[in-house]
Amino acid sequence: MKILILSFFLILGINLVFCQSSISLSATIYDQSPARNPDFEIPNAPNAVVKNMVLSTLGADKTPTYCCGDNGVYYNGQFDIHSQSTFDSWFHEIEGISYAVPYELVLIESKDEPGIYVYTSSSFFPIDGKGFDNKTLYPDEITYNGHNYHFCMKIHSSFTYHGGEYFTFAGDDDVWVYFDNNLLIDLGGLHTSASETVYLDNLGLTIGQSFPFDFFYCERHTYESNLNIITNLNLTCIEYDACGVCLGKNDTCCFVNKCETINRCLEADCNEGTNFQCDYHIKNCSDGDICSTDGCDIGFGCINLPINCDDGNYCTKDYCDPTYGCLHIETANCTECLETGCITVLPCFPVTCDSLNSSHCVASAMNCSDNDPCTSTECVNGECTYEWICGSEDSSSGVVDSSSGVVDSSSDVIDSSDIIIDSSSDIPIPTLSPSPQPSRFPTDTPTNTPMPPTRPPTPTEDPKIYEDPEDLDKDCLHCKDLGCILTGKSCGYLKNEKYEKSNCKENCCSHTPTCF
């Protein structure tokens, strides 16, 4: 009689176990992206199931243990997983790499076969618009083929073995299912839909005892996402975390409590220390660079722009040194104006500010004239040079100052009858020829000095700008650069007598503009 009563309650208990219309499995989905993890959307990925990518026993943290440390997993010479570092984010939340999102996977009892629970989807996209796919928080994130194709999902649960149970999975990509911490479904790799079934009667389990069930799934590549489950296991949860996830790690609490904000200048902490509530604080946008200004835009987030080192001095070169900060280097041959800096390129034509317009510069030829008709003057490299061009004759007194080479005359008119001619003298005989003869008298003035440039055209009554010479290089100074007409002056060109096009190197110009 006792045996009959026990059998009755056992059968009743089994029937009660399988009378529910659905099984809800709390899951954690870790959103990923190819830009953050190269294991996702691998180019030319092999279409094949790759076994032994994870160890056969579940890890101590209740996630699969990667097989190969820092080494990658290859199939036919192509990456399938890059390393332990890239694998870590598949089933763990790593800031900026993976994003934990809670999810409920609901298996529905079959109408035709009571006690059989089914989930079927050939378009499994559970987090479209969530995680990194949230365009409000991540407006620049790429959407692949209209869906979020890159994520991993884990489910922790348990079951009581009654005998006769089985579990069938079909889908893509990676799937690992552990029964009692042992890997029994191994469908790793990037592949189209693949399937496998586990019959629990073959596992040597004890009837009436409970065992852990751990399910891991990844979608890593477009263009398919299939997930299909058929089972008569009565999966239940023995413990939930603070966020309502079965055997979870509290890593979805921030998502549950809506810590997301459109204010990109705020950050939120959500952990045990905040009792899993959102604690907001201002984001630190400092990039540690003294050559940048740090700021934050509510819609964009941190903005780090180059610092402005302009000191308002047009005659300094301003830049930022990563060690010393802003530096200001003086520009050679520069005269500062109110609105610009005037830089002299040709030393004999110094550029200065226009006295009538502080936003313009004018170039003028250096004045080397000494008002002496017997000297020829010329500017060479910014210095005036002088050449004696008159004869060294005695005037009315017949006396020549040999120290200066200048004739000393006390009268305005030279009388030829007063000239004393000494044939033994080295002083040449004066001549009334209109062309002066070169002097043989020694002098300290330089010889063989080039003649000054030919004079520009005589100005007309109204100022004008003369046309550029055809052989004037575009990089040379032009009349349009001087602004002569603004001061009531014309602008013409002085020919460079030393100009030889074939021998030119840098700063070589056939003509030089000047105001007159």
UniProtKB/Swiss-Prot annotation:
Compositionally skewed regions (Low complexity) per UniProt: 418-427
Gene field: psiC
One cellular component term from this protein's GO annotations in UniProt: extracellular region
Keywords: Glycoprotein, Secreted, Signal
Leader sequence residues: 1-19
Disulfide bridge partners, by residue number: none
Stated name of the protein: Protein psiC
Upper classification of the organism: Eukaryota, Amoebozoa, Evosea, Eumycetozoa, Dictyostelia
InterPro entries according to UniProt: Fibro_Slime (IPR011874), PA14/GLEYA (IPR037524), PA14_dom (IPR011658), Prespore-cell_inducing_factor (IPR051154), S_mold_repeat (IPR001673)
Naturally occurring in which organism (per UniProt): Dictyostelium discoideum
Amino acid composition bias (Pro residues), ranges on this chain: 449-460
Transit peptide is among the record's keywords: no
PA14 domain mapped to chain residues: 109-249
Region (Disordered) location: 418-465
Glycosylated residues (UniProt): N134, N234, N250, N284, N333, N357, N367
Coiled coil: none
SMART domains in UniProt: PA14
Compartments, as annotated in UniProt: Secreted
PANTHER family hit by this protein: PROTEIN PSIB-RELATED-RELATED, PROTEIN PSIC
Family: Belongs to the prespore-cell-inducing factor family.
Pfam families linked: Dicty_CTDC, PA14
